[in-house]
Amino acid sequence: MGRVSAWEALLLGVVEGLTEFLPVSSTGHLTLLFHLLGLPVEEDPFLKTFLVAIQLGAILAVLLLYGRRLAADRALWLRIAVAFVPTGVIGFLFYPLIKGVILGNDAVVAFFLFFVGAVLLFADRLAERAQYQDVKALPLARVAWIGVFQGLAALFPGTSRSGATILGGLLLGLNRQAAAEFSFLLALPTMFAAVGYDLWKSAPEVPEGGWSLLLLGFLAALVTALVTVRWMLAFVARHGFRPFALYRMALAAVYAFFFLR
């Protein structure tokens, strides 16, 4: 616990809140930041608990923004459930592979940062001729395929959960804003399930003085995610996803420079 300071906890929470719902890979950013800060997240149980705390902060932001709408919209819940089923199946079947082999593979992260960025450039052009303006108009079979995209993202760090769901939505006919918004909503069951499973597999460890750092990171992620989600919808309406795609490709080069030399 002594390895992480208050300003590092704040910075990590802000980065989680900024990147969790953008199609840029929060895993890639946090891995790079842990490396730059010299924090051994794979060896420190408290840092693993800290990651759970900041992810919960980001999830809560979506719940606060969309909770009232979700409570009154059964059709939307149906689509979230349909998309979550293939995600859950893929995650359950391949969890040992994700944690034991793929997660932490720097070459995999760099490759998928670049690859998904390149495909996102193509998919963003398709959005100009989008067939569906609302996910509730999307056929359920296509909704399920968005869940497959999200499940595959869990297998390959650097893909980005939000990047995969947005990419899937665009390729399956959603416009930019509908794809982004459904990505936010699909994060609710997906991230709660992932966080819950991680907590079940390994009990959180919080040494004396650690709760204040967890709270700081949690609040930083919450506030930043609240701002980011609102900003992103307005941004993609004007500029599309091309800036994010180019950013991913540039980040892949930076990541490769630090980790693959």
From Swiss-Prot:
The chain crosses the membrane at residues 9-31, 46-66, 80-100, 102-122, 137-157, 180-200, 209-229, 240-260. It catalyses: di-trans,octa-cis-undecaprenyl diphosphate + H2O = di-trans,octa-cis-undecaprenyl phosphate + phosphate + H(+). One of its GO terms (biological process) is peptidoglycan biosynthetic process. It is a multi-pass membrane protein. It is found in: Cell inner membrane. It holds the Pfam family BacA. Keywords: Antibiotic resistance, Cell inner membrane, Cell membrane, Cell shape, Cell wall biogenesis/degradation, Hydrolase, Membrane, Peptidoglycan synthesis, Transmembrane, Transmembrane helix. The keyword Cell inner membrane applies. It is an enzyme of class 3 (hydrolase). Its main location: membrane. InterPro entries: UppP. One of its GO terms (cellular component) is plasma membrane. Belongs to the UppP family. Bacitracin is thought to be involved in the inhibition of peptidoglycan synthesis by sequestering undecaprenyl diphosphate, thereby reducing the pool of lipid carrier available. This is Undecaprenyl-diphosphatase. It comes from Thermus thermophilus (strain ATCC 27634 / DSM 579 / HB8). The gene is uppP.
